[in-house]
Swiss-Prot record:
This is Fatty acid oxidation complex subunit alpha. Involved in the aerobic and anaerobic degradation of long-chain fatty acids via beta-oxidation cycle. Catalyzes the formation of 3-oxoacyl-CoA from enoyl-CoA via L-3-hydroxyacyl-CoA. It can also use D-3-hydroxyacyl-CoA and cis-3-enoyl-CoA as substrate. Transmembrane segments: none annotated. In the N-terminal section; belongs to the enoyl-CoA hydratase/isomerase family. Heterotetramer of two alpha chains (FadB) and two beta chains (FadA). GO terms for molecular function: 3-hydroxybutyryl-CoA epimerase activity; delta(3)-delta(2)-enoyl-CoA isomerase activity; enoyl-CoA hydratase activity; long-chain-3-hydroxyacyl-CoA dehydrogenase activity; NAD+ binding. InterPro entries: 3-OHacyl-CoA_DH_CS, 3-OHacyl-CoA_DH_NAD-bd, 3HC_DH_C, 6-PGluconate_DH-like_C_sf, ClpP/crotonase-like_dom_sf, Enoyl-CoA_hyd/isom_CS, Enoyl-CoA_hydra/iso, FA_oxidation_alpha_subunit. Its EC number is 4.2.1.17, 5.1.2.3, 5.3.3.8, 1.1.1.35. It comes from Acinetobacter baumannii (strain ACICU).
C-alpha cells in the first residue's frame, strides 16, 4: 500500500499503474470535506515520492464517485468574508494543481454521480472514462455560488466557453451521451468494463500512443479565442443567461460570467485566482446563504421522512375517491410510480374526466420523450375506474378527494370505512378542514389521516401529511412512505384549520385585501410582489386558485382563527366572488383571461374589476411605497409561520421553510419565511411588526420572536 488514509488509498495494480481510490470512511458517499482535502494532499505527496508509479487510475469505493464539497462546512467558511474565502480556496487550488501537475498520466474512472467538486477533481485528470450509469455536472449555481475548485476554468478550456456556460448556468447533471458529445469525457463504457477501459487508457498514455501532455497543456493555457471571438462568445452567453436569471435575485450566474471573462485570456493559475475572487463575491450574498440553507433543509426533510419507513405497512393497492381533475391527477401520480390504484366516483362522466386527466398527463410524457408508448399503456392499466366499492377489500389505503365540503366528506368517509378492511388507512385530501373534525364521522379514527396534495398534482412536489388527534403513527408512516413512492416530498404537520400551508397563505391574502381596502392598486401589489420574487402576485394567484375556493377557505380559516383571520369588512376577494368573477375558472376575476397562441390563459387588465372593488375601498387611492407593500404582505405571512412553530403544527423551521417554498412558491432565493426573518434581523423584524401592529392581530409579533430578539437568537445558527 503506497498510501492508506481515511479518505484515499493508493495501491499498485500492475505495469506501473496505481489505483488512486476515494473511499471516505464512515460516510455513505465521498465528499470533499476538510479531512478529504488534507488526505488528498498527503496522497499526492505519497505518489510523488514513489518512483515506480507511471500512471494513475482514479476510482471510487462508493456507488457514487464524489458528490462534491461538504456543504455543511460552507456556513462557517462563508461567514468569514470575501478575503477569508479566497484564502481558504487558494490552498485547495494548490492541492488540485499539484495533482494535475504530476508528471504522469491520470484517468478518472467515473462510476456514479460526479458532481461539483467531484467533477472538478475529474477535470484535473488528463482523461475521463464514464460508466453508462454515471452522471457528471457542476450544479453549484443552484446553491447561489458557482464552481470554486477550478471547474469553471478547466471546463471552459476543455469544451469551450459556450458549452461550459450552459453546463454551469443550467446546473443540470449530464448523462453520458451528452458529456461525451460536448467533450467533457473521453469515453463511455458499460459499468463492468469501467476499470479495464480506464486502465487501458493509462497504458496507452504511458506507451506514448496518447499525447497526454499536449492534452493537459490545453487546460493550463488561456482560452483559445482571439479578443473579438471572446467578446462575441461572452455577449451571447450573457444574453442567454441573464434572460433566465435576474441578477438582483440570483447574482451567481452574472458573477460566474464575469470571472470567466476575466480569466479567459489568462493562464491557469491567474484564471483560478479570478475564479476564487468571483466565487467569494457570490458566497457572501444573502441569496447564497438562503439557497445553501435550502439544500440543507431539504436534507432535514428527507431525513425526517426516512424515519417513518420502519413503521409503515406496504401499500400494494391504493384507491382514490373522486375522479375529477384532482382525483385523476392523484391516480396518474400513483400509477406512474408503480402503485396500482382504483378510481371511484358516482357516475361515468366523472370517471371519464378522471381517466382523461390521467391520459392527457401520460400523453404529454410520451410527447416529451420521457416515456415510451408501451410504458404509457402499462401505467394506464394500473388505474381501474369503478362505480362500486366491490374491490375495496383489497385496498391498503384510500385517498378521499371529493368536494371541499365537510358534510359531503363526512358522508363519503363513513361510507368508505364500511367497505374496507379494518386496517385500511383512509386519507383525506382536504386542504383546510380539520382532520380531527372529519374523524368524528369514523369508527376507526386511528386509521384516518390527512394527505393534502397541491394542484396541479403532477407538478407540485409537496404533500402535507396531517396528524389528527387520534391518528396512529402507523397511519402517518404509511402515508409518508406512499407520498415518497409517488415522487412527492411529504412533511408531517399537526392538525388545525388550514394545516400549515393554507394557514400561512390566508393571512397573506388577508394582507392583500387590507392593502386594497386602504387604497392600493392591486396591479401595483402584484408587480411589487413579483419583483420581490414570487411566481405571481396575490391578485393573479387568487385568480389561478379560484376566487370561490379562496372565499370558502377563508370562511374555514375565519372560524378557526377569528382574532386574526375574520375581518370586520368586506374585502376585494369577496366582492369578486359576489360579482361571480371566479378568476381563471370563468375567465374573469381581478384580471380578464383569453387564450393565447399556445392555448394558455393569458391575463389582461379589466377595468370592470376596478368598478367591482371600488365600493369597498375606504382609503385614499394612492401610490403606495413598494417597501410598505412588501412589509405588509410578508409580515402577515411570516408571523403566521412562526405561530405554526409556536403551536407545534410543524416541528422545525427547516420543514416550515421547505413547505412554503414547495407549497406556495415562496421565493427560493429568500430561503423561506424563517430564513427571511433571520436575514431581516429578528430584532429589526419585531420592530417592523410593532410599526404595523395597528393594522390588526395578524401584524403583532409572536411571543417566540420577541423572546428570540431579547436573547439574540436566530432560527438558523
Amino acid at each position: 500500500m503506497i498510501h492508506a488514509g481515511n479518505a484515499i488509498t493508493v495501491q499498485m495494480l500492475a505495469d506501473g499503474i496505481a489505483e488512486f481510490r476515494f473511499d471516505l470512511q464512515g460516510e455513505s458517499v465521498n465528499k470533499f470535506n476538510r479531512a478529504t482535502i488534507e488526505d488528498f494532499k498527503a496522497a499526492i505527496a505519497a505518489v510523488k515520492a514513489n518512483n515506480d508509479i507511471k500512471g494513475l487510475v482514479v476510482t471510487s469505493g462508493k456507488s457514487t464517485f464524489i458528490v462534491g464539497a461538504d456543504i455543511t462546512e460552507f456556513g462557517q467558511n462563508f461567514a468569514q468574508g470575501e478575503k477569508a474565502i479566497v484564502d481558504w480556496l487558494m490552498p485547495v487550488h494548490e492541492i488540485f494543481n499539484s495533482f494535475e501537475d504530476l508528471d504522469l498520466p491520470k484517468v478518472a474512472a467515473i462510476n456514479g454521480m460526479a458532481l461539483g467538486g467531484g467533477f472538478e477533481m475529474c477535470l484535473v485528470c488528463d482523461y475521463r472514462v464514464m460508466s453508462e450509469a454515471a452522471q457528471v455536472g457542476l450544479p453549484e449555481i443552484k446553491l447561489g455560488i458557482y464552481p470554486g475548485f477550478g471547474g469553471s476554468v478547466r471546463l471552459s478550456r476543455l469544451i469551450g466557453i459556450d458549452n461550459a456556460v450552459e453546463w454551469m448556468a443550467m446546473a443540470t447533471p449530464k448523462k453520458p451521451a451528452a458529456a461525451l458529445k460536448d467533450g467533457a469525457v473521453d469515453a463511455v463504457v458499460a459499468a463492468d468494463k469501467l476499470l479495464d477501459a480506464a486502465t487501458d487508457l493509462v497504458k496507452q498514455a504511458i506507451s506514448g500512443r496518447l499525447n497526454w501532455k499536449a492534452k493537459r497543456q490545453e487546460k493550463l493555457e488561456a482560452v483559445k479565442l482571439n479578443p473579438l471571438e471572446q467578446m462575441m462568445a461572452f455577449n451571447t452567453a450573457k444574453g442567454a443567461v441573464l434572460a433566465k436569471a435576474n441578477p438582483a435575485q440570483y447574482p451567481a450566474p452574472k458573477l460566474l460570467l464575469d470571472s470567466l471573462q476575466a480569466g479567459a485570456s489568462l493562464a491557469r493559475d491567474e484564471a483560478l485566482k479570478a475564479e476564487a475572487e468571483g466565487f467569494a463575491k457570490a458566497a457572501v450574498t444573502p441569496q447564497a446563504e438562503a439557497l445553501i440553507g435550502l439544500f440543507i433543509n431539504d436534507q432535514v426533510v428527507k431525513k425526517a421522512s426516512k424515519q417513518h419507513e420502519k413503521g409503515a405497512h406496504p401499500v400494494n393497492q391504493a384507491a382514490v375517491l373522486g375522479a375529477g381533475i384532482m382525483g385523476g391527477g392523484i391516480a396518474y401520480q400513483a400509477a406512474s410510480k408503480g402503485t396500482p390504484i382504483i378510481m371511484k366516483d358516482i357516475g361515468n362522466p366523472q370517471l371519464a374526466l378522471g381517466m382523461k386527466e390521467a391520459n392527457n398527463l401520460l400523453t404529454k410524457q410520451v410527447e416529451r420523450k420521457k416515456m415510451k408508448p408501451a410504458q404509457m399503456g402499462e401505467t394506464l392499466a394500473r388505474i381501474r375506474p369503478t362505480l362500486s366499492y366491490e374491490e375495496f377489500k383489497e385496498v391498503d389505503i384510500v385517498i378521499e378527494a371529493v368536494t371541499e365540503n365537510p358534510k359531503v366528506k363526512e358522508i363519503v368517509l363513513a361510507e368508505t370505512e364500511k367497505n374496507v378492511r379494518e386496517n385500511t388507512i383512509i386519507a383525506s385530501n382536504t386542504s383546510t378542514i380539520s382532520i380531527t373534525r372529519l374523524a368524528k364521522a369514523l369508527q376507526r379514527p386511528e386509521n384516518f389521516v390527512g394527505m393534502h396534495f397541491f394542484n396541479p398534482v403532477h407538478m407540485m412536489p409537496l404533500v402535507e401529511v396531517i396528524r389528527g388527534e387520534k391518528t396512529s403513527e402507523e397511519a402517518i408512516a404509511t402515508t409518508v412512505v406512499l407520498a415518497q413512492k409517488m415522487g412527492k416530498t411529504p412533511i408531517v404537520v399537526n392538525d388545525c384549520p388550514g394545516f400549515l400551508v393554507n394557514r400561512v397563505l390566508f393571512p397573506y391574502f388577508g394582507a392583500f385585501d387590507l392593502l386594497v381596502k386602504d387604497g392600493a392598486d392591486f396591479q401595483q401589489i402584484d408587480n411589487v410582489m413579483s419583483k420581490f420574487g414570487w411566481p405571481m402576485g396575490p391578485a393573479y394567484l387568487i385568480d389561478v386558485v379560484g376566487i370561490d375556493t379562496g372565499v370558502h377557505g377563508a370562511e374555514v380559516m375565519a372560524e378557526g382563527f377569528p382574532d386574526r383571520m375574520k375581518p370586520d369588512y368586506k374585502g376585494a376577494i369577496e366582492a369578486m366572488y359576489e360579482a361571480k368573477r371566479l378568476g381563471q375558472k370563468n375567465d374573469v376575476g381581478f384580471y380578464k383571461y383569453e387564450l393565447d397562441k399556445k392555448g394558455k390563459k393569458a391575463k389582461t387588465v379589466d377595468p370592470t374589476a376596478y368598478e367591482v372593488i371600488a365600493p369597498f375601498v375606504t382609503g385614499e387611492k394612492r401610490e403606495f411605497d413598494n417597501q410598505e407593500i412588501i412589509d405588509r404582505m410578508m409580515l402577515a405571512l411570516c408571523n403566521e409561520t412562526v405561530r405554526c412553530l409556536e403551536d407545534n403544527i410543524v416541528a422545525t423551521a427547516s420543514e416550515a421553510d421547505m413547505a412554503m417554498i414547495m407549497g406556495i412558491g415562496f421565493p427560493p432565493f429568500r430561503g423561506g419565511p424563517c430564513r427571511y426573518i433571520d436575514q431581516t434581523g429578528v430584532a429589526e423584524y419585531v420592530a417592523l411588526c410593532d410599526k404595523y401592529a395597528h393594522l390588526g392581530k395578524a401584524y403583532e409579533a409572536p411571543q417566540m420572536l420577541r423572546d428570540m430578539a431579547a436573547n439574540n437568537k436566530k432560527f438558523y445558527g
